[in-house]
Design a protein with these regions (language model features):
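Extended, histidine- and acidic-residue-enriched regions that form the cofactor-binding/catalytic faces
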Residues: 2-117, 122-263
Length: 263
């Protein structure tokens, strides 16, 4: 039986050790935050968590290789799923609970003078903006931001249907990253989604939470039919390069020099 030798990555907190950590300097902590929920019929419940772990690790690797003093914290595997109470095992953390988790973790970082935190979000139901505003008042020395990989532009160059949830993009990622957990696409639903009858709610300037099972029959929004591992690999490398560069820049910029004159 052949054993697989694992190599410790010094920028992943769960893999490193006190001997290494106590003498190292860190400028940026990365907190991956996913969700546990159904992803159409063909993707695992932990899709967002796989993406959180893999994207954070690869981006941190890129930043670390350039000299960025970055550390990735263990991912939070549960997110806001208040619109899906009738989907079995769609686990929910209320925003207030998320705030308390962040407050406790930031208390540790602030005490230890790691004053830059990136919440790397992989779940559309999570929105940390208002929490960050409140936390900024509580921790004036901290720089806290959220990073949503799905907001990074460029996917339209590789995917026919960008979708929202368990569609071509996420399926391609999972086919590339962990194909053994992806069912054949012949078993996937089409990811058809109903829209609001009220036009403003579809135009983005008015908002209401969607009742998920009234919108989609298979829990997906976006057709995964054209997904391929090749597309997933290309776009994964694109977004992790962008996030890696972001983490590096954030690591090296002095805390009192975040702003500059607009050219």
């Amino acid at each position: 039986m052949t054993s697989i030798k694992l190599i410790m990555r010094p920028y992943i907190l769960a893999e490193t050790n006190w001997k290494a950590v106590k003498q190292a300097e860190f400028q940026v902590a990365v907190l991956p935050w996913g969700a546990t929920e159904a992803h159409n019929y063909h993707l695992p419940y932990g899709t967002d968590n796989v993406l959180a772990d893999r994207i954070a690790a690869e981006a941190a690797k890129i930043a670390f290789s350039r000299g960025g003093k970055v550390i990735v914290l263990p991912a939070i595997p549960f997110g806001v799923n208040t619109g899906q109470p009738d989907v079995k095992f769609d686990m929910n953390l209320n925003p207030g609970t998320q705030f308390m988790i962040l407050k406790d973790l930031i208390t540790v970082l602030d005490r230890q003078e790691i004053h830059k935190l990136v919440i790397l979000n992989t779940h559309g139901g999570n929105d940390f903006k208002q929490m960050i505003r409140e936390l900024n008042l509580l921790f004036p020395k901290m720089f806290i931001c959220q990073c949503n990989w799905f907001k990074i532009p460029g996917g339209e160059n590789y995917f026919e249907d960008m979708g929202e949830h368990a569609g071509e993009v996420e399926t391609s990622f999972m086919q590339y990253l962990i194909p053994e957990l992806v069912l054949p696409l012949s078993e996937a639903g089409e990811g058809k989604a109903r829209i609001f009858r009220v036009a403003a709610l579809n135009e983005g300037w008015a908002w209401a939470e969607r009742r998920w099972t009234q919108v989609t029959k298979d829990t997906g929004i976006g057709n995964p039919a054209l997904a391929t591992a090749g597309k997933g690999e290309i776009f994964f490398k694109l977004i992790t390069e962008k996030i890696g560069e972001f983490l590096f820049e954030l690591s090296v910029v002095p805390p009192d020099e975040f702003y500059k004159e607009k050219s």
